[in-house]
């Protein structure tokens, strides 16, 4: 519960499902589940020590799904399997591809995703020629049975929005009006909350000698910020089913301001 409250403090997320037991129960849940992105960060953080502690940057994601909701009191663990390696042309670093699966205390899958991260090479004088790049599905298939309750009605006064599936059109663009500035203090506390100890986010002394010259903000902060901003226009998009693909296209540093828009690709 403490983590859920802090997550709202860090992101300003306003989605009703994760904010109110009353709304969650009306929607068929036993109580409010924790925010899908908070669950992602908490689970993702478990993989950092083994995969990306010394990473140059986390580059992207594919085939991310959230098969089951997570509630306060659940225990989540994660395993990761290396599925590909690609040496960069400079011979000093390479990209590691991993498949990570998070499960709860009942061994029920709560998170499944693939990601790729750029990591320094131990031997930077010898070219290995390793080039084993996995392929990824373009979209995450819609399951025949989706593990969410049957929702009979949604209180639009409580959710804050009146727009539903039928109101969105492929090709439509939603310009969310807000911008949020990323603060060093919020980033530091949030990333520590997620137990993500990647050096690029915390070691300012080390980062001053890099081309960036300062700490990089954890990319998940940007994902959560964009999701929170999307509330204006997507108020009833209460649950994240999947993320087909994603990339950290540019680094973010303290003081940067994040804006977001949404394009409806398909309905």
In which residue ranges do the predicted regions lie?
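A broadly conserved detector of short glycine/acidic/proline-rich loop/turn motifs that flank catalytic sites
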Residues: 2, 82, 180-181, 186, ...
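Hot-dog-fold acyl-thioester-processing enzymes
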Residues: 2-59, 121-140, 145-243
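Short, structured motif recognition centered on aromatic/hydrophobic residues
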Residues: 7, 61, 76-80, 96, ...
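A cross-kingdom feature marking solvent-exposed beta-strand/loop segments within repeated
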Residues: 57-68, 82-84, 239-250, 265
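HotDog/MaoC-like acyl-thioester-processing domains
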Residues: 68-153, 254, 261-267
């Amino acid at each position: 519960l403490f983590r859920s409250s802090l997550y709202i403090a860090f992101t300003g997320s306003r989605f009703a499902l994760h904010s109110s037991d009353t709304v969650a129960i009306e929607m068929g849940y036993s109580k409010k589940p924790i925010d899908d992105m908070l669950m992602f960060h908490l689970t993702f953080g478990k993989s950092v020590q083994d995969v990306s502690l010394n990473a140059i940057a986390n580059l992207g994601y594919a085939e991310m799904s959230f098969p089951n909701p997570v509630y306060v009191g659940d225990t989540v663990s994660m395993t990761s399997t290396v599925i590909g390696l690609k040496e960069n042309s400079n011979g000093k670093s390479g990209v590691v591809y991993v498949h990570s699966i998070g499960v709860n205390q009942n061994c029920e899958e709560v998170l499944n995703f693939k990601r790729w991260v750029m990591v320094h090479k131990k031997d930077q004088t010898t070219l290995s020629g390793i080039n084993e790049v996995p392929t990824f599905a373009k979209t995450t298939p819609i399951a025949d049975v989706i593990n969410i309750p049957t929702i009979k009605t949604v209180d639009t006064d409580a959710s804050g929005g009146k727009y539903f599936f039928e109101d969105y059109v492929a090709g439509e663009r939603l310009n969310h009006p807000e911008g949020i500035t990323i603060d060093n203090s919020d980033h530091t506390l949030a990333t520590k909350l997620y137990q993500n100890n990647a050096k690029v986010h915390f070691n300012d002394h080390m980062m001053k000698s890099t081309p960036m010259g300062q700490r990089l903000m954890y990319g998940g902060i940007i994902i959560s910020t964009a999701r929170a901003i999307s509330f204006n226009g997507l108020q009833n998009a209460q649950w994240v089913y999947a993320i087909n693909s994603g990339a950290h296209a540019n680094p973010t540093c303290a003081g940067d301001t994040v804006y977001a828009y949404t394009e409806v690709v398909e309905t």
